[in-house]
Structures are given as structure tokens and as C-alpha cells.
Amino acid sequence: TSSNGLISKLLQSASVNMKEELEKLINRQQIVVNFDEQIIFGQLEQDESAVWSLLVASGYLKVEEIEYRGLTLEPWYSLSITNLETVSMFSNMFKSWFAAASANYNEFIKALLNGDVKAMNLYMNDIALATFSNFDAGKHVSERSQPERFYHGFVLGLLVEVRDLYEVRSNRESGYGRYDVILIPRNLDRDAMILEFKVKETEEKTLQETVQKALAQIEIKKYDAELKERGIPKERIRHYGFAFEGKKVLIG
């Protein structure tokens, strides 16, 4: 339907927080959000939370409960995915974000599963070039949050592409901090993976330096703690640092 096209466009350029809430929904968790139930279409571009209202009104999400908070009794809604049809609608939507680079996207997934870093770099840069600007939320977006919007969208795509082989978890506590993404194999014959994303800081001379920082962070903060607790040995855990500078990506 036409509202799906609108929902897709709004979610693609949505903030990192909103994409994280989508990840939870796809993983069949409930989320708690605040929005105005009266959708005013003119507000959709300005007020990000209006998308939740649109998703509820379209029947994709259902309200499990409402809690009224504060002096103004602001409504906070617990939302969950309505049914499997919604899961497939979201899956198709996330895939469509990378349609302009779909062949490269599939090749990237293959390279990631095979641990081929050279091919990962090649395809990831092609994907970023072809699709990066679609994640743009407009003129007011900082250079820093722009790549973040892109790679969180990328994680959502990853979530649906490899879900048969891996449980994809993101932004959770493990060791001494919060990792970006871990891929936990459903069959222990496969390697587990930790992905850390970093936007290049001005004081970093090269993207290689940014990659090294990402990899060091995985080690120092012991992000593999959760995987080891699940009985996955260290030699079966791959670490990848993704460094971003505008549309350029380096993976190491």
C-alpha cells in the first residue's frame, strides 16, 4: 500500500534510536514509546514518533498496554509486532533499502559468512556508494550521525538476511561495555562474530587507525564475554572493525 512506501522512507532516514527499537521488534520483543495517536500527515517529517502512530494505525504493531506518566499523564505505549505478516513486511522493507545494490549486498553477506575481508571491503563500499544518501534525514544531520543512520539500517538488513544462521544482537551489555553487533551461530559449526562500527575522528589520520581503535575496543572491553558464556571458544570468534568516513568504509 502507499502507506508502506511512506513508512519505509520515514524509517530509512530515522534516527539510530528508532532503528534500535525496530531491531527489538524484529527480535519479537516489546518496546515502550511515546507518541500522539492522532496522526497528522504533515507532522510525519518533523516528528519522528508519529511513525509509531502510523504503524499502529496500519495494523502492523499492536498496543499491549498504555501507561500514563508524569503530571501531564503522557501516554506511553507498549508495542509489539502484530503477526508474522508484519515480520515479513519489515524484512522486505529493510531489503528494499539496499535494492540499488542488491547483488553487492548478497555478495557482502556471502563474504562475511566466509570471512573474506577483501571481498567484504569491496562490496561494502559499493553498497555505501549506491545507498548511503537514502538514509539521509535532511540538511540538519551532522557528519557524524549520517554514517550511523546508514550502518544501523545496514544492521537491520543483516538481521533479516542471516537470521536462519545467526541470532543477531546489538547494543547489549557484555564484558565492560556495550558492543555494536554480535552474531551468535545457531549451529555451533559456524564462527561467531563481533562487529564494531566507528566513525573516523578528526584526530585519526587514516581509516586504518579507526579500524584498529574499533578492534582494540572489542578486546579491551571484552565484548566476547557473552559468547564465551555460551561455550563458544575464543578461536571461533571473529572480530571486525568497520570504519566510516562519509561514504567510505574500511573493514579490518
Feature annotation, model-predicted:
Residues 1-222, 249-252:
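Extended alpha-helical interface modules used as scaffolds for assembling large macromolecular complexes
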Residues 226-252:
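Domain-level recognition of nuclease-like catalytic cores that cleave nucleotide substrates
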